[in-house]
């Protein structure tokens, strides 16, 4: 049997941002990952740094970091957080790139949404940079897909 939890952001008065003022500052870490499916030829062009728009993975790293820092501006009920670090990594396989983003902060609320936002924007940036080589003759993207974006690890450590 599933136990229903109450939402912290809504009540009979409407939507609100949760007050975390009385919570202790805790060292928080979250890691998220996701995949983008691409043609093998596209992956090889990325590896060889031959994509016309520039270095795909370096650009996606920068985009992910910017997205993490601005998550509170994009997602309405997220708090601005005192981030202490962001790591962005990529694994390239024959048909996909896996993006992994780890976010750290010493704060009163978690960094999961920041990690998920970073992964999402990294993958969207990759797609944007390879559009010209991923399109088919009709201008469609039959093989390109973003999938499996999820939090794979979350930690809280008392200071």
From Swiss-Prot:
Coiled coil: none annotated. GO terms for molecular function: cyclic pyranopterin monophosphate synthase activity; GTP 3',8'-cyclase activity. Keywords: Molybdenum cofactor biosynthesis. The keyword Heme does not apply. This is Probable cyclic pyranopterin monophosphate synthase accessory protein. Pfam families: MoaC. The keyword Disulfide bond does not apply. InterPro entries: Mo_CF_biosynth-C_arc, MoaC, MoaC_sf, MoCo_biosynth_MoaA/MoaC, Mopterin_CF_biosynth-C_dom. Belongs to the MoaC family. One of its GO terms (biological process) is Mo-molybdopterin cofactor biosynthetic process. Signal peptide: none annotated. Pathway: Cofactor biosynthesis; molybdopterin biosynthesis. Together with MoaA, is involved in the conversion of 5'-GTP to cyclic pyranopterin monophosphate (cPMP or molybdopterin precursor Z). NCBIfam families: moaC, PRK09364.1, PRK12343.1. The active site is at residue 128.
């Amino acid at each position: 049997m599933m136990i229903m939890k109450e939402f912290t952001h809504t009540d009979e008065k409407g939507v609100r941002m949760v007050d975390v003022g009385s919570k202790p500052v805790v060292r928080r870490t979250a890691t998220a990952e996701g995949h983008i499916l691409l043609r093998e030829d596209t992956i090889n062009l990325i590896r060889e740094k031959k994509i016309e728009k520039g270095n795909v993975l370096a650009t996606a790293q920068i985009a992910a970091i910017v997205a993490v820092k601005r998550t509170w501006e994009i997602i309405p009920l997220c708090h601005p957080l005192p981030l202490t670090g962001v790591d962005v990594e990529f694994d390239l396989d024959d048909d996909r790139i896996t993006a992994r983003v780890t976010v750290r902060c010493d704060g009163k609320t978690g960094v999961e949404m920041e990690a998920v936002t970073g992964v999402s924007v990294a993958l969207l940036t990759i797609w944007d940079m390879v559009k010209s080589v991923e399109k088919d003759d009709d201008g469609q993207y039959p093989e390109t897909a973003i999938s499996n974006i999820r939090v794979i690890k979350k930690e809280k450590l008392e200071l």
